[in-house]
Structure formats: C-alpha cells, structure tokens
C-alpha cells in the first residue's frame, strides 16, 4: 500500500494508577469533552503481533469486555487482512512477502504495516450497542474526524454511496477490492482522499469494529486524541495474560489455520 505512515501510540504525562477490571491490570483516568461512551478503556498493545494474533486478541476482547474498549496495535511484519466474505484467491499473490489473515469482520483488502490500526469493542450490556451498526460506525468516524480537526486537518465523514452491502458486516467496500482505493459512505476523507475505513461484526457478546488509518502522517499522541473524542472518561490499560492466553488459543485454532485462511 502506498502512503504508509509514521504512527505513535505514546502516552504522555504521569497519572494516578488504579486497578482495571477488564482488559488489563493498570489504568489511569483522565477527562475529555465529547461522549459517545460513558467510559472507555484504552488498551495499549505496544508489542507488535502476528496478523493471526492481532485478530485473535480482538475476538478475545469481544468475548470478555464489560466496558467499551478501544485497542491500538501494531504488526510484527507487513500484512494483508481481508474480510470474512472475501476470497483467498484475491490475496494469495501477496504471500509470502506479506502475512495474510482473514478477518472476522467483513470488508475488503487492507494493507498493514505502518498504519495506525485500532479495534473498538462494545459489549452488549452497553447502551451504545442498541444503536444501529451504521450509526455506531458513523459516530466513531465523526469522533475520528474531530480528532483530525483538532490537529488542523480538514477531515470529513463522507456521505452518500453504499455503506458496505450485506449490512455493516461487509465494512466499507466490496470484499475483493482494496478498501482504501474505494471510498464509500462514512469513510473519513481529507482533501478527497480516504484516510480511514473500518468493518464490523455484531454478536450476542457485543460489537467489534476494526479500523485502519493510513496515508497521512500522525502526530504523537493522536491515538489518545481519538479515544478522548469518543468518551469524556478514558482509562489506560494493558492487555492481561488471561486475554493473551485466550488469543493464543484462537490464533492456533482459528486465525492461523489454513482452513480459516482459505474458507472461501
């Protein structure tokens, strides 16, 4: 993917450390001005992971989170993720140069490397879960656009077009296409270019939205600004061993298998 970007997940300042009940051991409370969520946990996954492990951690968080959570993460090596409904034949040519993985969410083909990748997990017990998938999708992207505006970028959330077909499960574009070459409704755009897209999966446990931001240089602390545009009450957290152990199991039995990769 052209336009790979530098990203930063740095956390600045010292804050009082408390005990987290969800995805990590320690978190630090801070306040912001906008609210989509009453409380949002920010999981900082500073260790680059394989493509299969990244997908597995997201699913493990969806299974266990009781508070809305946003996770920012990196990739161990250049990777390509493609949607649940995608065909393996559409991405096969990118191996072995890139790590390939089928997402549990829908959508098209996404090239990963230096992008800022995130997942938002909304447990079924949270009131936001009762909103429609497209409404949640748009509200998250409006918060992202606001974060860009806060650093002087003229970001907009695109209107019109198809939000993804097959409901929001198919994310932002046809499953066999490069997501960032095919902007559609609710994408985040700057100067006519798509710089952020995402895809969703809704289950009885909650809603998972996986997104990528690329094609633009991000300033240090941007990830925090994005999170704080989603909630007035953010809490920092690490991924705990229980989540990691469950993710390793999912990576071994599901995301890292040939049967999952070649499902279609």
Per-range role (PLM):
Residues 117-173:
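Contiguous, small/hydrophobic- and glycine-enriched helical/loop subdomains that border
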Residues 107-120:
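Short coil-to-beta-strand
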Residues 1, 6-26, 30, 35, ...:
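A cross-taxon signal for low-complexity, glycine/charged-rich
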Residues 149, 153-220:
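A contiguous pocket-lining binding segment that forms or flanks enzyme active sites
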Residues 90-92, 128-131, 218-224:
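Short, conserved charged micro-motifs
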